[in-house]
Amino acid sequence: MAVVTMKQLLDSGAHFGHQTRRWNPKMKRFIFTDRNGIYIIDLQQTLTYIDKAYEFVKETVAHGGSIMFVGTKKQAQESIAEEATRVGMPYVNQRWLGGMLTNFSTVHKRLQRLKELEAMEQTGGFEGRTKKEILMLTREKNKLERSLGGIRDMQKVPSAIWVVDTNKEHLAVAEARKLNIPIIAILDTNCDPDLVDYPIPGNDDAIRSAALLTKVVASAVAEGLQARAGAGADKAAAEAAEPLAEWEQELLAGATTAAPEAAAGEAAAPEQS
């Protein structure tokens, strides 16, 4: 069964590109035609590229990797948070803070501070402080939550990132490329395909298109997680099998050696009349 159908792509408006005067010539090979001054994206190619991206994401996650979801434009914010949360992956849907990837050690310290403030609030750590101190701590916590909440459980840089609108998320793209982190992204007609490892030609401005393609990536993550869980269960079952004691191993080795000798003896014995 196809990951997504042509009808779903058409219904979401994934085929609509930008106006013909706002385009990147490198995207020419992904364009089917133009109508009324708007480029129409070749959805047949989109389907092919979706399959490639889906397989990459699934395999990456199955082997223990993680995918960061990035989309801070209004049209993408909701679906980015919703789909990433559904599959337990980190996401950025507010503002990309410089160094989120390239200076993760510093970002990780801010995450620790966020958790520290949350723990203080929940365990009564704010009690006994002045109203001004409580207000300052609460503001600090809310600010950290807003900017870092989506990556609160991220322990290291992701294995790959999913991006909605590479032009808007140019900082995230630049950091990922600097660290050689693979980029999966929607490629609208004004984007640069050379910056993306796993492109999906499509409309990155329509809410439904961004949501559909983000859901596809999340589904690939979910399938990868299932494969990872299955592999883990098989490994656990193998490790759980109780090893043979030394005397049992010797007995088994003796039985294995004795069997061929007995068979040879029977073959050499003369028949009795």
Swiss-Prot record:
Question: What are the protein's UniProt keywords?
Answer: Ribonucleoprotein, Ribosomal protein
Gene Ontology biological process terms from the UniProt entry: translation
Tell me the InterPro entries matching this sequence: Ribosomal_uS2, Ribosomal_uS2_bac/mit/plastid, Ribosomal_uS2_CS, Ribosomal_uS2_flav_dom_sf
One CC-aspect GO term: cytosolic small ribosomal subunit
Q: Which PROSITE patterns match?
A: RIBOSOMAL_S2_1 (PS00962)
Does the record bear Ribosomal protein in its keywords?
yes
Tell me which family the UniProt entry assigns to this protein. Answer: Belongs to the universal ribosomal protein uS2 family.
The entry's protein name is: Small ribosomal subunit protein uS2
Q: Please tell me the species this chain comes from.
A: Mycolicibacterium vanbaalenii (strain DSM 7251 / JCM 13017 / BCRC 16820 / KCTC 9966 / NRRL B-24157 / PYR-1)
This protein's gene is called rpsB
